[in-house]
């Protein structure tokens, strides 16, 4: 089996998309390929068919490889709950909560498990494309590293180092990273990649030659800056406002926002523009307000209260349409109770009181794939998605359920999810990916179009669009990199 590891000079330099591109290229060339990231830190996660939790970047990479996402592609997932604490997910299930120092002291015990996972991949696939995290030059973390050079050494993988020229200082970051590596680590780095380049590459070439003289490894290519409609899990990046897009969707950007990838399918609508808001001054008059998921719902509710957005949301709810997802659904209720102090020591807190329901946080985390139908006799409306939450919500007779769940992790079930008020303009659900399917997204956006005097439209199938974008990504990267050299590095062709 062949293997290659993509590391970067920093976070957000484009490692995840380079891995996805290589997965798609190798697949196109007829090889069985699998992505692997030993440890990921992200608030954007996904639930596999067997109910396990993993990072979204490896989900996109799995699709690029033509595979169903599996938790073994990302055995360790860290989900920050505050600046100093995180929830640890191991093999798709909650392992526990820890401080940064606690996990630092803990992680070496996972090395054997990671090696076992990788050995299994060696048996099942022709090529494994690995991804590092942050930078391999974090010298204070070197002795307990299990995600960058520590993982590369564990499985004897060659490394390609990616730098982001769009940030500026790419030559310094590449040379500086190499300077801080140990001799054995330097020998693993077989080439550099410059990512996100804008302009004429001829102007860059003298710098590439000088860089090679300094670091003594070749530059394998320059990848142009490209806007793609693919998920970004590293942070809630600002959406690009579309010119002349008549439908304005505002999204509350809370401090602990999670699973904002729920919004990606909305970006596929040509006449829809999405913007984040963090203050009441930015609120304005959106056609739809989305309150997304949160890793700390109570803290984010306090944030809405403190910055004045609570007042703006309540005023908007009189005539505007609101969709809350997971934590965003919970804050719409009248009360949130936390008897086991899962999130804070407050015990309970009043919600926005836009839906007559109460949420209680439990000790056990719900992680499940679901299929549901919208409770609307006029429409055959099916939604596929997943749930990740620790709260159970109960509502009064004044509130109608939004969906009926009929499949849970492949088993037939029959229970309700979500809620919608009597007026029909405020609703919420626990289902992540609720907009990914055509029917519900099309229904919501067409209601907004009609309200503005616009014609209804058919929505794109998000999965088809994603496949086209992955092929586009692969084409760009194939044309930009020396693939013959990369095949030589991994010992193939």
Swiss-Prot record:
Source organism, top-level taxon: Bacteria
Record keyword DNA damage present: no
PROSITE patterns per the UniProt record, alphabetical: GATASE_COBBQ
InterPro entries, sorted: Class_I_gatase-like, CobQ/CobB/MinD/ParA_Nub-bd_dom, CobQ_GATase1, CobQ_N, CobQ_synth, GATase_3, P-loop_NTPase
Keywords: Cobalamin biosynthesis, Glutamine amidotransferase
Keyword Coiled coil carried by entry: no
Official protein name in the record: Cobyric acid synthase
Organism: Clostridium botulinum (strain Langeland / NCTC 10281 / Type F)
Lineage summary: Bacteria, Bacillati, Bacillota, Clostridia, Eubacteriales
Gene giving rise to this polypeptide: cobQ
């Amino acid at each position: 089996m062949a293997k290659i590891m993509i590391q970067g000079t920093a976070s957000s330099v484009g490692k995840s998309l380079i891995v996805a591109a290589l997965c798609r290229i190798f697949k196109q060339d007829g090889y069985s390929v699998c992505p692997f990231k030993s440890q990921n830190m992200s608030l954007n996660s996904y639930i596999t068919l067997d109910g396990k939790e993993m990072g979204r970047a490896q989900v996109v990479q799995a699709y690029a490889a033509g595979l169903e996402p599996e938790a073994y592609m990302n055995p360790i997932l860290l989900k920050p709950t505050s600046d100093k604490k995180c929830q640890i997910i191991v093999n798709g299930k909650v392992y526990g909560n820890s401080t940064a120092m606690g996990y630092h002291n803990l992680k070496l015990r996972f090395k054997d498990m990671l090696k076992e996972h990788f050995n299994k991949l060696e048996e099942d696939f022709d090529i494994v494309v690995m991804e590092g995290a942050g930078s391999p030059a974090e010298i204070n973390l070197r002795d307990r590293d299990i995600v960058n050079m520590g993982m590369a050494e564990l499985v004897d993988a060659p490394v390609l180092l990616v730098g982001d020229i769009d940030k500026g200082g790419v030559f310094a970051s590449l040379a500086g990273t190499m300077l801080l590596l140990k001799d054995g680590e330097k020998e693993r780095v077989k080439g550099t990649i410059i990512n996100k380049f804008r302009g004429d590459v001829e102007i860059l070439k003298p710098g590439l030659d000088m860089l090679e003289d300094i670091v003594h490894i070749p530059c394998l290519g320059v990848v142009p800056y490209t806007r793609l409609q693919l998920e970004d899990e590293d942070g809630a990046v600002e959406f690009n406002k579309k010119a002349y897009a008549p439908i304005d969707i505002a999204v509350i950007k809370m401090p602990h926002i999670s699973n904002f990838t729920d919004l990606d399918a909305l970006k596929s609508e040509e006449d829809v523009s999405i913007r984040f808001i963090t203050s009441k001054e930015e609120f304005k008059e959106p056609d739809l307000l989305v309150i997304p998921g949160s890793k700390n719902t109570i803290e984010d509710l306090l944030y809405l209260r403190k910055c004045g957005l609570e007042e703006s949301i309540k005023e908007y709810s009189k005539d505007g349409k609101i969709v809350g997802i997971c934590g965003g659904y919970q804050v719409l209720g009248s009360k949130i109770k936390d008897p086991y102090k899962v999130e804070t020591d407050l015990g309970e807190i009043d919600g926005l009181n836009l839906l007559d329901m109460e949420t209680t946080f439990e000790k056990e985390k719900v992680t499940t794939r679901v299929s549901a139908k919208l409770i609307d006799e006029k429409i055959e409306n099916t939604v596929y998605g997943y749930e990740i939450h620790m709260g159970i919500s109960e509502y009064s007779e004044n509130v109608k359920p939004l969906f009926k769940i009929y499949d849970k992790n492949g088993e037939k079930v029959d229970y309700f999810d979500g809620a919608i008020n009597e007026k029909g303009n405020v609703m919420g659900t626990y289902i992540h990916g609720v907009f990914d399917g055509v029917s519900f997204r099309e229904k919501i956006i067409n209601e907004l179009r009609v309200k503005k005097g616009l014609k209804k439209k058919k929505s794109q199938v998000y999965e088809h669009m994603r496949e086209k974008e992955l092929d586009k990504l692969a084409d760009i990267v194939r044309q930009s990199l020396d693939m013959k050299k990369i095949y030589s590095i991994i010992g193939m062709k």
